Amino acid sequence: MLDKLAFLQEKYEDLGEKISDPEIINDQVQWQKLIKEHSEIEPIVMKYREYKTTQQALGETKEIMHDKATDAELKEMAKMEVEELEESIVEMEEQLKVMLLPTDPNDDKNVIVEIRGGAGGDEAGLFAAVLFRMYTRYAERSGWKVEMMSLNESGVGGYKEVIFMIKGKGAYSQLKYESGAHRVQRIPTTESGGRIHTSTATVVIMPEAEDVGEVNIDTNELRIDVFRSSGNGGQSVNTTDSAVRITHLPTGLVVSCQDGKSQLKNKEKAMKVLKSRLLDQMIQEQDAEISQDRRSKVGTGDRSERIRTYNFPQGRVTDHRINVTVYKLDAFLDGEINEMIDSLITSAQAEKMQEVQ
């Protein structure tokens, strides 16, 4: 680990010199690339420098503690300081191990979220709407923007399907473990006998595909159909062919968008979703190549995997992958999901650390 940290510090200093070079500054593409690389390794280098400074302080304090000329009171103070410094060093070593873990290249990206009502009829659609509100409230609390892509309502205040984008640095790193089947247990308002019903909704989290180079789509492989929107956007929505359906012929992926009144905007949104689905498909294929014994319990992103249960009578939320339960259901559904997300990230990091050891 120390060799790798020393190498990164040397690289950081070398990059610092390069980004100050007038010739490189004139090449904005190269300069931006170096700036990005420099900023990515800066936190690790700063932590490594702090670690080395603490190591040096520990050595000096130990010398004072073992010096025969040091009086008893000062030795006692030095002993206490040694204990504190040793604790700090152990903590920093763990932090550095985590910082050196391989990073997901998609972590900083915006995300496209797809939520669909599953088993349970109208209740499933209502639960899909609850999850939509939960994620949009979480986005607001994080200072991120939400952009609606497509909405298909169920007619009872629920959603058959809702697709939206969350724009914010690091959105994918925080939300990528939300993909899977979410289960709800509650008493429907229409249930006179007070029986608890179980229904599900599926969530898919995809990183937004970059416009340049990341996902190449041949326009000859697309079939684009336009049709009249069936949404609740007023009469003007239904009098023009503003809705768009794009079919990617090689994969059979189909994306529809009818949320806006502009056919052009609907087409742009549908293309964004299609690109992100294709990128997500590539990620899923890469994950499938990982041998079963090394596959992360948290990060499989299996779309059919039941990952979480929301139990209304007991006021609890349980994540089945990490066996964590929180008893703050109302707050959780209002977007206060950081505690669960942090636990999932910590668990995923622990699994990665076991793999690299």
From Swiss-Prot:
Subcellular location(s) of the protein: Cytoplasm
Top-rank lineage group of the source organism: Bacteria
Cellular component annotations (GO), alphabetically ordered: cytoplasm
GO terms for MF: translation release factor activity, codon specific
Record PTM text: Methylated by PrmC. Methylation increases the termination efficiency of RF1.
UniProt cross-references to SUPFAM superfamilies, sorted A to Z: Release factor
Pfam families in alphabetical order: PCRF, RF-1
Keywords: Cytoplasm, Methylation, Protein biosynthesis
Residue numbers of N5-methylglutamine PTMs: 235
Family of the protein in this entry: Belongs to the prokaryotic/mitochondrial release factor family.
HAMAP family: Rel_fac_1 (MF_00093)
Function, in words: Peptide chain release factor 1 directs the termination of translation in response to the peptide chain termination codons UAG and UAA.
Descriptive protein name: Peptide chain release factor 1
Gene: prfA
